[in-house]
A protein has these predicted regions:
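Charged, low-complexity, helix/coiled-coil-prone segments
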Residues: 1-5, 31-39, 124-133, 147-165
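Basic, Lys/Arg-rich alpha-helical nucleic-acid-recognition elements, primarily the DNA-binding modules
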Residues: 1-80
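Exposed alpha-helical structural elements
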Residues: 8, 26, 37, 88-91, ...
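Residues that form generic nucleotide/phosphate-binding pockets
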Residues: 12, 16, 30, 99, ...
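Short secondary-structure junctions and interdomain/linker hinges
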Residues: 16, 20, 103, 107, ...
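Helix-turn-helix/homeodomain-like alpha-helical modules used for DNA recognition
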Residues: 73-150
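Hydrophobic protein-protein interaction segments
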Residues: 137-315
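Charge-dense, low-complexity intrinsically disordered regions
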Residues: 311-336
Length: 336
């Protein structure tokens, strides 16, 4: 086997099992060889046999065709297929939690995030907003038949979904992050609420006002985090240490959502895909190129957490002013 294919395969395996167990333990039982024999293959001292390659690819759901085609300008991504979702809040959060648990298991992980419209992790402080976002995705974008004749209505978030969201938030908050925002933050989300109101997709039209009220709480909480430069859950106290939060303002526009992570073991990237799905890769060339771009985004943005109070206040003033404008339009229509 070509050395670069075997090397790439083991890089993908490290990505898939990161933090769960060692390469040696993960493959010794599967291949019926000792951990030492696995590491000889890992170091390219011993080539994998065709049967070993088949077992690995089948077990870890890796495309051998993609491995053979790897080269300059070609990248292997992994993603959760849509057929693995049942479009419940629980199902969606379970996939995100698994990714965060893998990230948290790495040594000294850090995050750099460019936010395009919605910040899902901050949204988790207010589960009703996440539930609406997922419902909109399933009914309007994917047109799932089960949602065709349904109206969105108020439902209490299940205990399981609440626990999943809380665990994701706890991990996200604990990992130092640099985050780039722009003035279009959450504007698309507001238009989605307005669209559902006009299309009579709310069982209770006044629920649209409730969602805008939750957005105002979200703005207040995000601003409080920016003031102190620390992430923490809504309704809790600011932590004495850790949870570092650097908030940057890009005065033009963030064209996409890029979630870059770095640790002592590896660096990688998540990209949004099909609106709310995501792609993941640890391809060194692609990740390095993306890191270079996001570093330039930060250089062209203004730090507004802790410092630059004037710019920070202006950002949140414009954000809340827009929320109030959308809310007042619906409120006036309800009263007419």
């Amino acid at each position: 086997m070509k050395e670069n294919i075997q090397t790439t395969l083991f890089q993908l395996l490290k990505q898939k099992i990161a933090g769960e167990e060692s390469i040696g333990n993960a493959l010794s039982d599967l291949l019926s060889v000792s951990p030492d024999a696995v590491y000889r293959r890992y170091r390219n001292e011993t080539p994998l046999t065709i049967q070993e390659l088949k077992k690995i690819c089948n077990h870890f759901e890796i495309s051998f065709d993609a491995l053979c085609e790897m080269g300059d300008g070609k990248v292997v991504f992994s993603y959760p297929p849509l057929n693995t979702f049942d479009f419940s809040l629980e199902s969606y959060l379970e996939g995100i939690l698994k990714a965060f648990q893998k990230l948290k298991s790495l040594s000294s992980p850090e995050i750099i995030l460019s936010v395009n419209n919605v910040h899902l992790f901050q949204l988790l402080n207010f589960p009703q907003l996440v539930r609406f976002k997922l419902y909109f995705w399933a009914k309007t974008h994917l047109q799932i038949p089960d949602y065709k004749d349904k109206h969105f209505r108020h439902e209490k978030t299940s205990e399981n979904a609440f626990a999943l969201g809380k665990e994701i938030l706890q991990i996200y908050n604990s990992i130092p992050s640099k985050e780039i925002y722009d003035f279009d933050f959450m504007r698309g989300f507001m238009r989605q609420i307005q669209y559902y109101y006009k299309a009579h997709h709310f069982e209770d039209p006044e629920y649209a006002l409730f969602l805008f009220d939750r957005m105002l709480l979200m703005s207040s909480h995000l601003k409080e985090q920016a003031n102190v430069g620390k992430k923490f859950m809504f309704g809790t106290q600011v932590p004495a240490s850790g949870n570092s939060f650097e908030m940057y303002l890009n005065e033009t526009i963030n064209s996409d959502v890029t979630f870059y992570f770095n640790s002592k073991e590896q660096q990688g990237l998540y990209l949004t895909h099909n609106i709310m799905n995501y792609l993941e890769t640890t391809n060194q060339s692609y990740v390095s190129d993306s890191k270079m771009i996001i570093d330039k985004q930060i250089a062209n943005s203004s730090l507004i957490s802790i410092v630059n109070e004037k710019e920070r206040n202006h950002f949140f003033y414009e954000f809340e002013r827009t929320i109030h404008l959308f809310r007042k339009k619906i409120e006036a229509d309800l009263e007419s």
